[in-house]
């Protein structure tokens, strides 16, 4: 194996390195485009970030504690799939914030997360149970985070509105 192919195989998993974050990015993009969401900007930003930190942190701790070998024998960080955990956490965040606007937003988020999971197994980076655990982890932590946020931050009316019109960014603040 050449050095170039080894470095690409070792440090880049390809498209799923980017796709895992797309559902989370979509939460902020849809909100910025003015699509009606469940929560105001502050609560959305705090809750979405907290769900990512809880999911990514827990996946990292489990990977370094359990030390399950990957199917390709490259390292002992197979369980759970962090890519899948992040993708499903983002998909669940997308569903929580925009699922009532259109069910297709939820379908797109979970479809993308499922693609990431299947791709991780197809690339021989994870066993099926690694991605199943990652999906469950991402879903559960996001549900818990949204439940807790409703207890800590009661819903308020939107005080900041951001939107795009043509080539301008519009910001309105309610005082």
Language model segments and positions:
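Interfacial segments of alpha-helical transmembrane regions
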Residues: 34-55
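Short coil/turn segments at secondary-structure junctions
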Residues: 9-10, 45
């Amino acid at each position: 194996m050449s050095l170039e192919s080894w470095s690409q195989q070792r440090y880049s998993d390809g498209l799923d390195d980017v796709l895992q974050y797309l559902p989370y990015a979509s939460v902020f993009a849809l909100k910025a485009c003015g699509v009606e969401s469940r929560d105001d900007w502050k609560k959305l930003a705090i809750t979405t970030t907290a769900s990512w930190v809880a999911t990514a942190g827990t996946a990292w701790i489990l990977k370094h504690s359990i030390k399950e070998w990957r199917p390709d024998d490259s390292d002992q960080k197979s369980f759970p799939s962090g890519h899948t955990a992040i993708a499903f956490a983002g998909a669940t965040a997308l569903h929580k914030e925009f699922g009532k606007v259109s069910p297709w937003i939820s379908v797109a988020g979970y479809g993308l997360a499922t693609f990431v999971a299947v791709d991780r197994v197809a690339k021989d980076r994870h066993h099926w149970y690694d991605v199943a655990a990652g999906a469950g982890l991402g879903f559960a932590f996001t549900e818990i985070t949204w439940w807790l946020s409703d207890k800590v931050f009661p819903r308020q009316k939107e005080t900041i509105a951001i939107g795009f019109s043509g080539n301008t960014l519009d910001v309105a603040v309610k005082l």
